[in-house]
């Protein structure tokens, strides 16, 4: 189910504070976060946020088309290594 429209979008407090501080100073620097559940809001546009994927932080530049999505959608946690090859020699 989607989040109720009565509620505000979820953004972690520490992440929101960092973004507001950078907007006040009008600086652009990479913000490191583990909060994959935070929703992208319009004040984040133009910032680079390094999102944790379970192993490392992936830097993602926030654009206006990303507003309303979650940060975790842009940092995949799994890497597809390919399907196992079928060994035809062992079947004979």
From Swiss-Prot:
InterPro entries: Ribosomal_uS19, Ribosomal_uS19_bac-type, Ribosomal_uS19_CS, Ribosomal_uS19_SF. One of its GO terms (molecular function) is structural constituent of ribosome. The keyword Ribonucleoprotein applies. Keywords: Chloroplast, Plastid, Ribonucleoprotein, Ribosomal protein, RNA-binding, rRNA-binding. Its main location: plastid. GO terms for cellular component: chloroplast; mitochondrial small ribosomal subunit. Pfam families: Ribosomal_S19 (PF00203). It is found in: Plastid, Chloroplast. The keyword Nuclease does not apply. This is Small ribosomal subunit protein uS19c. The gene is rps19.
